[in-house]
Amino acid sequence: MTKILKYLFYSFVGAFLSITLFIGVFIYKAKRGINFYHTDPIELPLNLGEKSILVFSKANGFRHSEAIEASLPIYEQMAHKNGWKIFMTEDAGVFNELQLVLFQVVIWNNTSGKVLTDNQRTIFKKWIEDGGGFIGVHAAGDDSHQ
């Protein structure tokens, strides 16, 4: 009988600790976010041309999957119809001085959480100040919560 009670006791303690840990991680992520950054430059297509658009859909917070997936073909259709080149990524490594200047417009497509490092934010801000076009779609403003 004591073996059964010990087993039940340790099972209860284990379950309690597991649930507490899960809730703690969930609360931490909800309040502070857990950010993953891409800093290495990425491989871009060679045929970008003079009218090129970057569609950036990274989510370090809540991911609006349905909205992101539904919008990508629409951006492709618009680009094709207007003769624009389009590049879609969730890799923030493209936010560097050498690659960002290859685009005339950047669309933040339902981005959430803090998706750029401080250095990438500085580069992006300068790119906008130098005349780059920026469009923020739906949750793109969610980055301001951090």
Name every feature range the model reports, one short phrase each.
Residues 53, 100-146:
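Short alpha-beta junction capping motif
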Residues 8, 35, 87-88, 108-109, ...:
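Mixed-charge, polar/low-complexity N-terminal
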Residues 1-19:
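N-terminal Sec-pathway targeting helices
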Residues 3-6, 51-52, 121:
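Basic side chains
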Residues 14-102:
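Aromatic-Pro/Gly-enriched surface loop or interdomain linker
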